[in-house]
């Protein structure tokens, strides 16, 4: 019995109790899906629900009385062996071995779809992350946002949301002029300009510009700078996209800030917000009255000299997302962007959206690496591409995804290079590789999931304590994915995979899949192969949500 099947069965029992007049609830108040969770103490049963505590007040009764009525009906469900009432009205449900074991076959049949749900169906989400300036290579700070942002997008999609992963290119403003000036100076053997960009990569970009425009040195500075700016920008974005691809991060949209300016979107945004009554003029400048929406001060949109501010571009960009039909806009920003929370929510409110529903600003903490070598090419930073070459994509992505975004993080390269259980990514990947190896060995020994074209599976044979433990973790996986999507916390998936890996290793050591020596293949062997393959599937599904590979061999 899967958690979903039990959830639907509880809902059906509730509806029957309401129809019979045993519980005084409107039928519309009965949820289609009732949340079930694994109790912390497995002596309290296989599954628990607090539905009685949720609905008792509406039914005009106390939770224990509500639970008593519901438990009588739950005991009649096929596969349920016991129902106990705990505390103020919690229902603890125990399923028999056959019902519990049936999950293994259900997982194998569901394949890559196991763990997906429709909780966020109908949600159209714009997920913006990384958005590094195109003036240099991606570094370690961007690495965490790339890993987290992509993992969040994946768990949202697994919960039914329509997600667009978007990279906002800050290609307008003074930093682009400084970037062009830095490349120009290198081309002409001049010192790095004040406030300019150092690093060998600037010289490399200069070489690319020279290759594309051999006569660039013959042009005047005024004529050369626009050419250099465009060519160096294109080359740097190509490098950024290649690095992201190597890291396994794919963006659906690369959105140019400069295009907002060129299309008149800034002026349009000011006009639209003025029509809403939120824009005013003062001191020759144009302001958005963000204090009406909880900001600590009003924000300038157009300076007195007629130049738009970055804030104006932020407003135009938000309106672009709104106009493109996104019901939810998620921004993943660094720790130095705390001040953006109120101003972005103020923009949303001024645009007529609900800042508690239509926009979400996630703030992450910085990450460091013990013993990392600074990149001379990039000017004393740790480059993402160097991290990938040094530690491997999987180790970096998994390590960054297994901690909450708002917790400071220091990566330990020595740990991540170990092929031991101390290394979390190795621990989980090895469990998957071990399960695939076990399946190959079982098949070589004559164990198949089918006999004469029919499935050979007897769930009641999965009655060992380690099998019950493993099944419990596999059964909890869908609710973990749903919670990770709801809270934007993919680390929940990583930690659960580690629990599954541990349970699998304990089961593997206790229960043989393949027969030994001349032993005959039995239904126990075949049924255990189903459980083994179910574990492989869940580990692979979970690793994929984190952007990490599931190796067949290690």
Curated annotation (Swiss-Prot):
UniProt entry tagged with the keyword Coiled coil: no
Organism domain of life: Bacteria
Disulfide bond annotation, renumbered to this chain: none
GO CC, one annotated term: cytoplasm
Subcellular location: Cytoplasm
A Pfam cross-reference name: Arg_tRNA_synt_N
Keywords of this entry: Aminoacyl-tRNA synthetase, ATP-binding, Cytoplasm, Ligase, Nucleotide-binding, Protein biosynthesis
Keyword Magnesium appears in the UniProt entry: no
GO molecular function, one term: arginine-tRNA ligase activity
Chief subcellular location: cytoplasm
Gene3D superfamilies (UniProt xref): Arginyl tRNA synthetase N-terminal domain, HUPs, Isoleucyl-tRNA Synthetase, Domain 1
Annotated SMART domains: Arg_tRNA_synt_N, DALR_1
NCBIfam families cross-referenced by the UniProt entry: argS
Recorded family membership: Belongs to the class-I aminoacyl-tRNA synthetase family.
Assembly, per entry: Monomer.
Protein name: Arginine--tRNA ligase
Protein source organism: Pseudarthrobacter chlorophenolicus (strain ATCC 700700 / DSM 12829 / CIP 107037 / JCM 12360 / KCTC 9906 / NCIMB 13794 / A6) (Arthrobacter chlorophenolicus)
